[in-house]
Amino acid sequence: MARMSFLSFLLFCLTSVAHGNKANKHKPWIETEYQGIVMENDNTVLLNPPLFALDKDAPLHYAGEICGFRVHNGPGGSGSAQFEAVVLDRSTGEGLVRSKEPLDCESQKEHSFTIQAYDCGEGPDGTNSKKSHKATVHVRVNDVNEFSPVFVERRYEASVPEGRLFDRIVRVEAVDADCSPQYSQICFYDIITPNVPFTIDNDGNIKNTEPLDSKRQRVHSFWVTAFDCGKNRAQADAQVIVTVKPSCKPGWIGWTKRIEYTPGSGSIPLFPNLHLETCEETVWNIQATVELQTSHIGKGCDRDSYSDRSVRRLCGAVRGEVDLLPPPSPATNWTAALPTLPSSDSSLVFSFNGSTHVAVVPDSVASAVSGDHFTLQLWMRRGGASTQPPANQARGTRKEEETIVCSTVKNDDSYSHYSLSVHGCRLSLFYWPDVSAARPVKFLWKLEQVCDSEWHHLSLSVQFPSVTLYVDGVTFDPALIHDNGAIPNPAPHQRLVIGACWEPEEKPKDIVNNTMPENKDTGKFVSGYKGLLSGVTVRPGNVEPHSVVECLYACREGLDFGDLETLGSGMKVHVNPSQSVLVLEGDDIESFNRAVQQVTYRNSLRFATPGVRPLKLTTSLRCFSEESCLSLRQLEGYLVVLQPDAPQISLSGVGPHLARPAAEFEGPQGVPLFPELRIVCSLSHAVNTAAQGMEGGALMSDAVAHTLDGCEVQPLGEELNTEREELLVDMESLRERGLDIINTTAYIAITGAESISVYEDVLRSIHYRLAKGSARFERRFRLSCSEMNGRYTSNELTLEVNFLHSLDSLYHPSHLLASQQQFLHPSHHTGELSGHTLPNPHRNSVVPGAATVIIMVCVGFLVVMVILGVFRIRSIHRRGEGARGGGKEGGNQWDDSALTIIVNPMETYENRMGITTDMEGECEDEEEVVDSPDDTSDDQRIIIKKEGRDSAPRRY
């Protein structure tokens, strides 16, 4: 019974499971929205996300499988007609959407419809099938570049006047039927006809690349094509016809872009053939601006290449200036910490950063420039070496006050204070005659030169209460301000600072003792200067006259006007102080054209700085009818200053040998080294000074052509030994001429701009002196000179000095034995004749007979003659010079060779014995024998000093 119950229960469970497999409990699930893309030439839609239907009844057969998708119409009502969805895998539910027919992007770019998934139900017949929710599908049809561009017109025509450049002559247009921006847009046009003076841009605008000439070609015909962004070319090209109409050519005629200037030419016209054509347009005002750019030449323009001190001498400036920023040295170490920059004119340029770069001048130097009458001069450039002028030339944007020089000096029993500062585009001098009593006075100038980031020279002449400012040699008047505000008194301590101002620390007063604390120099630097400074000098005493200041620092090149008397009525000419901008203004065309042809460029330097100076001409016209008034473009060119002819400085009239007895060199004045020196400059000095265009121009041009600025005398080989030799120079004569000298054992350098004749006199006065007893046999010197701050150098003149020693000077009687049995011992002179070979000291102690002595003397004389001849032949081959002089007995006189003969003291021995002979003629027939130096029978010894070949490096 129990067994039957168990079988019944098992049968019931199997029946229940069978009924459970056929149940379809869940409906499929898909995404709510799909984005699709389909190409025009394809029917498969790429969906994002991919089409997958999921069913929770999986993995049941039928109920967990996806049997299909249904497409329903969207808002447009065309979804089911154009698209279908198929199942790719029933178990995973993957599906695919595709179009039933080819799609056309140009007809419809986007399609929207809904899609629904359904499962397989409970059996193969799909009983009890369930459907998912409806998902929206958006399909975008991607374009294919199937269409080519088509021009709107097949032919385009335009007419333009000749002689002008146009921004647009005619515009061509092409369209593309593709639907997408990528293929429907025209990316570029192209002129396919070669060698036509036209160009076309991407928008189809055609313009000419050069002025058209109707006489050369009246009609221009060419073809253009178009390309879409898919690089499809137009189906048919378009023809463009441009007709050139004869017309007037308004503008400047005769413009030359390149102008050459030869140094030394004076003034040359820049536009000798230039004239303005207005084509009968009524013009009531014409203004032309000529700009010459020289800011890249030196410090703002072409100036003298000499040192500041030399230029001051040439211009006749008063001496006595004190250099506040000298080159760093052990004696002038207050500038050692300042960074320096290279300069084209070899001057020293110091950089200041507004904080740490400050120069404190020692009190010993500051006390030398005290007083209320002084001249302060300096080169200044705001902002540093890398700063460029602002493009918009905005002024006054910098509000920080920057102090250039700040000085408190003691005058007798009081202290005076002044400071030179820049504030934006303003330059101010703050002067306090007496810091303990008087109130300060402020002199103010508003200058564009202060804030244009260019090099400018400032010269401030103070004769309190009168102050005069020169900027690049041009005078500027100040605005006087009596400042009675609450300004603290400067500390009564002498201090001169460059690049900032010293602000002492305030100390509280001791109320109990009613005293001030102990005076300690504590404080800080304030109002630091940011920029470059060079040549900062102060000269106490009377100020320089205007002509000297202009000669010192005015530009030597610039624009000028030829003849103001020929200027027509109604014409105006204005030239800026630096002569880099010239403005012409008038109302008459003919007068204006004549005036333009009078604009000149001048450069008063004989050795002008070569290079390019950009040139611009800007024209502004005003007409009665502003709408039709002509507009002229800016003309640009350049002026080329050619390389000047290098002067050939020739030194002659010296040597190459100078032979004198050693006794003359040992005299108190020594011997002049260059008594017949001649200095010649081969360059022609004809300078056109008729139209220099400025005061002092002719003077400088003439002075430059005949001026040297340095010569150097250098001993070759070893340096001078001050204990045995020296070069003597007339220091008083140098001071009178204002020349400087550097006198060392390695060289003597004389510097300063002076005429050739002055340098000849100075060099001729140089003497060479030996100390008594100096056994020197030769010394070589080299002389060279330079011009234009070392820019041009002379030839190197080498002089060999030979010292002729007598027998007594070489062999003092004390060196000989009283006995006639021994000759000179060489050890007595080895110290003096270092480097020379002396004979073997061993001698025969037996006194020879008279005949033997005579024979030995004759033979020795012949040996001397033979050896001299051999060495003369070697000297001829070595130097390439012919020997001068004869060779007869004791009357022989040799040329200045580096050869010294020392005769054996046998001759002295004979004189002391009273022996004479007349047998010299017989000795001439004797055999000529040259024995070895070691032979004990030698009676004559020859000591030879060869010419030295070492030389020191050249400083010129």
UniProtKB/Swiss-Prot annotation:
Residues 921-956 are annotated as: Disordered. Glycans are attached at N333, N353, N513, N743. It is found in: Postsynaptic cell membrane; Endoplasmic reticulum membrane; Golgi apparatus membrane. GO terms for cellular component: cell surface; endoplasmic reticulum membrane; Golgi membrane; postsynaptic membrane. The keyword Glycoprotein applies. GO terms for molecular function: calcium ion binding; cell-cell adhesion mediator activity; neurexin family protein binding. Disulfide bonds: none annotated. CDD domains: Cadherin_repeat (cd11304). PROSITE patterns: CADHERIN_2. Residues 872-956 are cytoplasmic. One of its GO terms (biological process) is positive regulation of synapse assembly. The keyword Nucleotide-binding does not apply. Keywords: Calcium, Cell adhesion, Cell membrane, Endoplasmic reticulum, Glycoprotein, Golgi apparatus, Membrane, Postsynaptic cell membrane, Repeat, Signal, Synapse, Transmembrane, Transmembrane helix. Pfam families: Cadherin, CLSTN_C. Residues 921-937 have a biased composition (Acidic residues). Residues 21-850 are extracellular. By 48 hours post-fertilization (hpf), widely expressed in the brain, with strong expression in the telencephalon and the midbrain. Not expressed in the optic tectum. Coiled coil: none annotated. Gene3D superfamilies: 2.60.120.200, Cadherins. The chain crosses the membrane at residues 851-871. It is a single-pass type I membrane protein. Belongs to the calsyntenin family. Synaptic adhesion molecule. Promotes synapse development by acting as a cell adhesion molecule at the postsynaptic membrane, which associates with presynaptic neurexins. The cytoplasmic domain binds synaptic Ca(2+). Homooligomer and heterooligomer; mediates both homophilic and heterophilc interactions with clstn1 and clstn2 paralogs via cadherin domains. Interacts (via cadherin domains) with both alpha and beta isoforms of neurexins. This is Calsyntenin-3.
